[in-house]
Amino acid sequence: MTKKHGRIIAAATDGACSGNPGPGGWGALIRFEDGSVQEFGGFETNTTNNRMELTAALEVLKKLRDFDRDPHLRIRTDSKYLIDGFETWIKGWKKKGWRTASGKQVLNQDLWEALDQYRLANVRLEYVKGHSGDPDNERVDDIAVSFSKKIAIQLQCDHHIQNEK
């Protein structure tokens, strides 16, 4: 991997879905200290908004493993479900055999397990209110919605971060 961009200093994720369940998309970006931005996203035919939120975060965590990053990096998201699940609920779910407090099977267990596997020390999730003018949140929302609707969108992408639609 090239180090030409320096450390990752910021990241953002979002998910979108039409119908819930229905066609969905996710969008993400990472910012490097040299000012460059890497954007990526994906599409699923039959999914939910929550699955797309989790997928976006998972894809960012996978990318973060390959780069130097700010030791206090925060992944910004407008999904309280993602934040609460990743930061708090997952500990109890694992202790209870992936059951909720009411005894039901945890939804999206496959993605929660993958997120836990790719968890990185000192990387936390940070809430940003959706559609509040935050530029990174607005951009990843645009990416997620475009992918969910199969609308072409130009992504900022360097050669070492691959994007396929």
UniProtKB/Swiss-Prot annotation:
PANTHER family: RIBONUCLEASE H1. It is an enzyme of class 3 (hydrolase). GO terms for molecular function: magnesium ion binding; nucleic acid binding; RNA-DNA hybrid ribonuclease activity. InterPro entries: RNase_H, RNaseH-like_sf, RNaseH_domain, RNaseH_sf, RNaseHI. It comes from Prochlorococcus marinus (strain SARG / CCMP1375 / SS120). Endonuclease that specifically degrades the RNA of RNA-DNA hybrids. This is Ribonuclease H. Its EC number is 3.1.26.4. GO terms for cellular component: cytoplasm. Gene3D superfamilies: Ribonuclease H-like superfamily/Ribonuclease H. The lineage of its organism: Bacteria, Bacillati, Cyanobacteriota, Cyanophyceae, Synechococcales. The gene is rnhA. It is found in: Cytoplasm. Binds 1 Mg(2+) ion per subunit. May bind a second metal ion at a regulatory site, or after substrate binding. Mg(2+) 1 binds at residues 14, 53, 78. Its cofactor is Mg(2+). HAMAP family: RNase_H.
